[in-house]
Amino acid sequence: MADGSHSFNFPAPQVSCLRPGEIVVDLFAGGGGASEALKQALGIDPALAYNHDEWAIGMHAANHPLTIHHREDIWHADPRKDVAGRPVGWFHASPDCTHFSQAKGGQPRSHKTRALSWVALKWIGQLLRADLRDGTNTAPRILSLENVWQILTWGPLVAKRCKATGRVMKMDGTVAARGEHVPVANQQLVPDKRHSGRTWRQFVAALESKGYRVEWRKLTASDFGAGTSRERLFLLARRDGQPIVWPAPTHGTAPGMQPRVRAADCLDFSIPCPSIFTRKRPLADATLRRIAKGVMRHVLQSADPFIVPATHQGSDRVN
């Protein structure tokens, strides 16, 4: 509700797809949203969760006290040691999305950040090799990956060029001198449009080479009861011969569907907060355009405008 008490009415798990003894692993675990979804769907907390950030791990630990937490660089984790011979039934990864998001615009990208999805292949490869050597069955049976849908354009990076001179843009914002060699580490890197999606296709092919059937879809959060219209790319992969089953939307305008949840239903407007227009760092042009579009659509041109008026007593109420 508008007092901040809105909650989702997720159905309790009826038949878990996990087999006896299987565990759940959550990479890039933040506040615990994905882990909570997995818990509600599968009926158990993740056994292992990873993040390099102290605050993220702290929040996840508060929300999932039964999970063993590893605060470390995910590239340095030892899956064979941490799994300890237990079969991984579901393996989830939500790698950093900022270097694929359209909100990044023309800003420089990071090779290392964009490569984080490959960690999933590292886990799978190491566990498959251990299984082959030891006669175990620890490698993930089901894999899920969530990211912005622009990850479908994942490909190589190239140096950003000055539009006026055609020369390389350096990380300090200056333009390379004529004939100057700029090391890659000092270049502003942007996606190479000539090879858009090449690395994504290689990633999928690598999963398939490990015996996984792979599918992906772009899903809209508001179709499933969340108070946001954000679109996300979900990849599912499994190597047990079973079909991949996608959920059907539960919210929308079609007959029999639940009404979509508004973001306002999840907010408590009585809590004081600073204005986004008074922040030190100015809003991006794309954000300002979205705000203007929202004001036009939901306030100025709406027959039932959404307004939060301030009363003379200083309190707010939602119309």
Regions found by a protein language model. Give the residues of each.
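Redox-cofactor binding/interface segments in oxidoreductases and associated redox assembly factors
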Residues: 72, 92-93, 145
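Short, well-ordered alpha-helices that flank and scaffold nucleotide-derived cofactor binding pockets
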Residues: 36-40, 62, 122-125
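Receiver (REC) domain switch-region micro-motif
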Residues: 24, 91, 143
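S-adenosyl-L-methionine
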Residues: 1-50, 56, 58-85
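Conserved beta-strand segments of alpha/beta enzyme cores
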Residues: 45-48, 67-68, 213-215
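Conserved short alpha-helix immediately C-terminal to the canonical SAM/SAH-binding motif I
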Residues: 55-59, 116
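Class I S-adenosyl-L-methionine
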Residues: 80-88, 97-319
